[in-house]
Amino acid sequence: MTTVRQRIDTQHRDAIHDAQLNIYGSRLATCGSDRLVKIFEVRPNGQSYPMAELVGHSGPVWKVSWAHPKYGGLLASASYDKKVIIWNEQQGRWQKAYEWAAHEASTTCVAFAPHQYGLMLASASADGDIGILRYDNSSNEWISSKIQKCHEQGVNSVCWAPGSADPAAKKRLVSAGNDKNVKIWAFDDATNEWILEKTLAGHTDFVREAAWCPVTNNGQHTIVSCGMEGNLVLFRTSNIETEEWKAKLLETAPCALYHSSFSPCGSFLSVAGDDNVITIWRENLQGQWIKVPRDNKEREGMSQAVGAPGAQR
């Protein structure tokens, strides 16, 4: 049974669009239509304390992303004002470290890459482009580039493939857009360009988010996407270099689905939709994704449906 561990009064003055914990679960970043980014300390005893209120955007802030802690306290935010802002914590104080305003429409998403890729982040925009920012240690500057015309009518989300200890492994990311497609992009070291590697079909309406599982299992990669038609689609490949991606429809919800996100260990998936409900999915030993019941009554119903006593797993 899933339970609410704690509630945090963020005191945002308008709708909250995103909330992200850092890798340790000790800090929470939130953002909203009030144009603010807020940071809270989250303690193991369930208590939370406000740490900072970051002011810098001139429009609603849609998304926040934490960098790996090896790079210090870095947080990125994406806003309707077309900007990506990177915030840096130094001696307990947060300040704007870098601002990038190269998109021509709302910046819908931002995501730091796994630390194996180096200090990098990707941004998605309603202008149809994906932005890439990479920190160059030799010049101590952020180097920017774009993957242009990725999705017609706009890009809604970007998510990086898990990092690899193999230095020869390709950098990859997945994007979701209003063209009803999920696309995988790979970086070509020879040409120094991002190449469209695969287009994945499974939606009949805008794809709101695509999440790449942060953990591989014996070389198996997993992506989950959700869309406005209510489809929750699982894509898998047993070998990303040689095998095709296979699609499986996990569910068609009775409402639009907006968000999908894996747990850090990759064994749980959360999905949020227009019905104000968050559903949790988990992968069983057979590699199948099943819903986690929200309460005991639902658990009993699921157990009866599969013909097993409620006490068994």
From Swiss-Prot:
Cellular component (GO) terms are: COPII vesicle coat; endoplasmic reticulum membrane; lysosomal membrane; nuclear pore; nuclear pore outer ring
Pfam families for the chain: WD40
Presence of the UniProt keyword Protein transport in the record: yes
In what way does this protein cross or attach to the membrane? Peripheral membrane protein
Q: Where in the cell is it found?
A: Cytoplasmic vesicle, COPII-coated vesicle membrane; Endoplasmic reticulum membrane; Nucleus, Nuclear pore complex; Lysosome membrane
One Gene Ontology biological process? mRNA transport
Name of the protein in its database record: Protein SEC13 homolog
From which organism does this entry originate? Answer: Caenorhabditis elegans
Q: Which gene encodes it?
A: npp-20
